[in-house]
Design a protein with these regions (language model features):
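Active-site beta->alpha loop and helix N-cap motifs at the rims of alpha/beta catalytic domains
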Residues: 2-12, 17-148
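Catalytic alpha/beta core domains of metabolic enzymes, predominantly
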Residues: 128-130, 142-191
């Protein structure tokens, strides 16, 4: 059974840090990471909605994660959101995150085109396969992704031994209970 203690506590989203020209500011990234360490949070969720992942290049996302890991690696649990608008870049970010030693990677479902549930599960499994030694977090955010995580793909996903958690941002609070009950002992549900 995996040790879930690294996921218990406050794990805030890590905000995007830009300079006056709108470029990722690595110095500000490091300052924010240092701030999180000083404040005593359990970890950080890097590269998600608050990190403006959809608007950043793969290189910007890699550099941001590298700076966060450099400052807070070993001090904070680091979950790297790696989803992109295509599977190949998502897998590239997943492999990069694993090479840095993050605790977990996470991904929203593919956006824009509404894919069938089996294709969403395959997308997530492909991404998690690019980081085979790293936990995977399913991110359920239907209000932005345009698709809600239902039980059939969830059940399919938890067959994957790397799937450790679901980050649930859906409105029905019953989803939290449903995912926890189905995920079982040792499965984490972030809210």
């Amino acid at each position: 059974m995996r040790d879930i203690s690294k996921y218990q506590g406050i794990i805030p989203a890590f905000y995007a840090c830009y300079d006056e020209k709108g470029e990722v500011d690595e110095g500000r990234v490091e300052q924010l990471a240092e701030y999180m360490v000083r404040k005593g949070v359990k970890g950080v969720y890097v590269g998600g909605s608050s990190g403006e992942c959809i608007y950043q290049s793969v290189d910007d996302r890699k550099r941001t994660l590298e700076r966060v890991v450099r400052v807070s690696g070993g001090k904070l649990t680091i979950i790297a959101h790696v989803a992109c608008n295509n599977t190949a870049e998502s897998m590239e970010l997943a492999a990069h995150a694993q090479s840095l030693g993050v605790d977990a990677i996470a991904a929203i479902p593919p956006i824009y085109f509404h894919l069938p549930e089996y294709a969403i599960a395959q997308y997530w499994n492909d991404i998690s396969g690019a980081a085979p030694d790293t936990d995977f977090v399913i991110y359920n955010i239907p209000q932005l992704a345009g698709v809600a995580l239902t039980m059939p793909p969830f059940r399919e996903m938890i067959k994957n031994p790397r799937v450790a958690a679901v980050k649930n941002s859906s409105m029905p609070t019953q989803d939290i209970q449903m995912f926890k009950a189905e995920g079982g002992e040792g499965f984490v549900v972030f809210n």
